[in-house]
């Protein structure tokens, strides 16, 4: 075979190469986002392994409600706060279910409700909230009578505020240890702003509907009852509800108002349903 033929044969058999295909920008962003989440998860695991349990729990609780960075997410204009889908409110009904824990799935519950305890402010209470499938939501644990002295379960903010003004109040179908709990309604996404508190005695034995009228909720801001002559004072009429919280606290309506039906230690409350009602 001639040299030319050998040369032609060599070049003919040499595989051709093409420039590597570029990954679409959207795909690259997804991969980068996934990698960032993995790195963030590893960092959080390391952080939790060295933090005392109360501080680790506080970090997780703040991130559940405020997003990555916890409280720092509040000052980040690009941070997206986790929310949940608001219930559809139908006009003309005698009641409006907000949360039915008897029919809620575990995934729904985990994406909508979380524990929020006094360890976010240096306390030592240790409580959790769980869903007993087909039965109820349970808030249980231990409270300590130092620092904050509270434990709670709270919903994530609704993705839009709901108007319950045509109703008379909110009822909590519950049972438990007989202590004095309180329901808190939020009308803003700022936890340092005014929120509306109302205390109630938790029934023992069987589930009962505890009715809490909007007119009886009191405005509280940062652990202090807001007085009528103050600029922050406003009443609760149910026209704007953004989140709901159920709490056991050593205080009733502010830090100068002790809860006389509270004792530190073990506690539990079971909740079947939270709904708006008309008399």
Predicted regions and their residues:
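N-terminal chloroplast transit peptides
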Residues: 1-29, 40
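Beta-rich carbohydrate-recognition modules and glycan-binding surfaces
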Residues: 36-279
């Amino acid at each position: 075979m001639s040299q030319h033929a050998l040369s032609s044969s060599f070049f003919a058999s040499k595989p051709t190469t093409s420039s590597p295909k570029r990954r679409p920008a959207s795909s690259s962003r997804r991969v980068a986002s996934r990698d960032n989440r993995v790195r963030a998860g590893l960092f959080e695991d390391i952080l939790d392994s060295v933090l005392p349990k109360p501080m680790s729990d506080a970090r997780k609780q703040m991130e559940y409600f405020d997003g990555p960075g916890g409280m720092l997410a509040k000052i980040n204009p690009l941070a997206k706060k986790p929310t949940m889908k608001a219930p559809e409110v139908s006009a003309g009904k005698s009641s409006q279910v907000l949360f039915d824990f008897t029919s809620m799935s575990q995934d729904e519950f985990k994406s909508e409700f979380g524990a929020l305890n006094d360890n976010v402010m240096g306390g030592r209470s240790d409580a959790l909230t769980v869903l007993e499938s087909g039965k109820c939501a349970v808030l249980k644990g231990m409270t300590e009578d130092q620092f904050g002295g509270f434990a709670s379960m709270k919903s994530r903010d609704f993705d839009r505020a709901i108007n319950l003004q045509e109703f008379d109040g909110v009822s909590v179908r519950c049972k438990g240890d007989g202590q004095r709990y309180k329901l808190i309604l939020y009308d803003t996404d700022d936890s340092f702003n005014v929120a509306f508190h109302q205390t109630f005695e938790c029934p023992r034995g069987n589930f009962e509907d505890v009715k809490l009228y909007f007119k009886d909720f009191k405005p509280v801001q940062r652990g202090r009852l807001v007085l009528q002559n103050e600029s922050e004072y406003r009443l609760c009429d149910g026209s704007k509800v953004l989140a709901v919280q159920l709490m056991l606290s050593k205080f009733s309506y502010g830090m100068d108002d002790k809860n006389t039906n509270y004792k530190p230690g073990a506690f539990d409350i079971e909740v079947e349903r939270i709904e708006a009602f008309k008399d």
